[in-house]
Amino acid sequence: MLTLRQYDAADKAMWDDFVIRRSRNATFLFCRDYVEYHADRFADNSLVFSDGRRLVALFLASRHGDVLQAHGGLTYGGLVMPDKGFGAATAVAVIGALKDYCRAENISRIIYKPVPHIYHRYPSEDDIYAIVASGGRLSEAAVSSAIDLTAPLRPDENTRRG
């Protein structure tokens, strides 16, 4: 059975291990020391999802009144997914549990800022699929670009213009 609970300082080692060694889409920005640098400016409301003793996912978030935001102290956030054993069905269950939690906590809105694909070790959109499947909608889109420094490519005029 999938459960979720708020992050606690006692979870730091487990959280950082998952972020650094076992996630498909986390970056160093999700390590607790980096996140807690902003502790005085954001009400941390990060969540830990588990299935029995197995860690299933993390959600780096802050709370602002009745809004849960994929952490306000970071450029992006979203669901931190493991590199193995997590697919669309699990993502749907996690998002369902997140919605139930928000209802119970009188949170009326979730702002989700996914990790750009260029930072994924194993790119996937299981989280985006689950959000859309559960009735979520896109409210904002951002452009991400990457340059392979081992094979630089000069952007053409159309790329520069957007």
Positions of the model-derived regions?
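Conserved alpha/beta cores of soluble small-molecule-handling proteins
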Residues: L98-Y101, I107, G135, E140
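Short, conserved acidic/polar surface loops in the N-terminal third of protein domains
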Residues: A70-G73, A91, R121-E125, D156-N158
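Short, basic/aromatic recognition patches
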Residues: N25-A39
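Conserved GNAT acetyl-CoA-binding A-motif
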Residues: E105-P116
